């Protein structure tokens, strides 16, 4: 028997018959060759335990982010760090937007935390608005979870509004968790890492998964000036949680700025074409600042595409969405055209 949690996301590539997995929002160019070379070289060391402190990787991240090494904790993917944060911080109440990434509330629920949700409006393009400030003042949560660009909507959190949220969280004594995992592949996104030293309540989540096409290696990290929190999070994680190949891959990936630049150029060119193609097929496509698009189509679309070997991310289980909502990664011209051709064929059934 196979054991897995309800409504899993990721891993569609392993389902029978899937030839094109658009459910995972990874780099459209795949994995940098230098990263693959680093993984191959690391195989000679797999008989040894990995460094439990990820010292070389942490030093590389510190140089890349311009922060002190003691502000960094690495994990077995961003998801592990979400769960470790929830266990270490143990807020009794939390707030998030809806829709957003489900692992925040999953991790919080395991700690008995009550989660309040601020609804993002479709008529506003799912863009966060000033109403979230009054919502937070009313709910006064112990922790606030935000995602920029948001998953699945692809919208960046407006910088001026983020400044006000930070100020309000400091005033309320609320921790602020900001997921920046898709920021590297977005247009115009600016990290909050320069704000870390202002306030230890700020926590940033990062991942190699999306930016460098490394979902199968599981590698993420977080940044915060709250050293006590990082120590508790580390205690919540299993030892040797980042493998030898993953650590080597992370170090190599951080030197791939040109690869990221090329990926962003592909996304910049292909996203408008894909959006227009989806709209021509009668879908309602939401604005996006990220490397993926949220759209509404026929309820049966997902199943019809699976029969044609293509997997989308069904967003039916997201708070604030429902059946007929889908998310697709923006990929290469050829892959995007395969999707559109399959959708046209499905519509003719």
What function would you assign to each model-found segment?
Residues 1-48, 140:
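N-terminal "arm"/small-domain region of PLP-dependent enzymes with the aminotransferase-like
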């Amino acid at each position: 028997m196979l054991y897995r949690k309800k409504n899993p996301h990721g891993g569609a590539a392993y389902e029978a018959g899937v030839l094109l997995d658009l459910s995972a929002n990874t780099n459209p160019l795949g994995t940098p060759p230098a990263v693959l070379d680093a993984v191959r070289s690391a195989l000679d060391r797999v008989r040894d335990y990995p460094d439990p402190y990820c010292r070389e990787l942490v030093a590389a991240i510190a140089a890349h982010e311009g922060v002190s090494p003691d502000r960094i904790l690495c994990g077995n993917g961003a998801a592990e760090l979400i769960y470790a944060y929830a266990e270490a911080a143990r807020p009794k109440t939390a707030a998030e937007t809806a829709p957003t990434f489900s692992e925040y509330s999953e991790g919080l629920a395991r700690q008995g935390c009550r989660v309040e949700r601020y609804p993002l409006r479709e008529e506003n393009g799912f863009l966060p608005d000033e109403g979230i400030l009054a919502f937070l003042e009313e709910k006064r949560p112990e922790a606030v979870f935000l995602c920029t660009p948001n998953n699945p909507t692809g919208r960046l959190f407006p910088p001026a509004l983020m400044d006000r949220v930070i100020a309000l969280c400091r005033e309320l004594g609320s921790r602020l968790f900001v997921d920046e995992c898709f920021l590297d592949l977005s247009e115009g996104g600016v990290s909050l890492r320069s704000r870390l030293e202002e306030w230890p309540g700020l926590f940033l989540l990062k991942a190699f998964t999306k930016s460098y096409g490394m979902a199968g290696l599981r590698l993420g990290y977080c940044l915060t000036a709250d050293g006590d929190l990082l120590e508790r999070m580390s205690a919540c994680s299993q030892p040797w949680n980042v493998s030898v190949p993953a650590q080597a891959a992370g170090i190599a990936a951080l030197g791939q700025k040109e690869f990221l630049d090329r990926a962003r150029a592909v996304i910049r060119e292909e996203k408008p074409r894909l959006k227009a193609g989806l709209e021509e097929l009668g879908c309602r496509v939401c604005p996006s600042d990220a490397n993926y698009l949220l759209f509404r189509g026929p309820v049966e679309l997902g199943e019809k595409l699976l029969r044609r070997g293509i997997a989308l991310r069904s967003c039916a289980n997201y708070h604030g969405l429902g059946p007929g909502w889908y998310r697709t990664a923006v990929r290469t011209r050829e892959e995007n055209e395969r999707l559109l051709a399959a959708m046209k064929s499905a519509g003719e059934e």
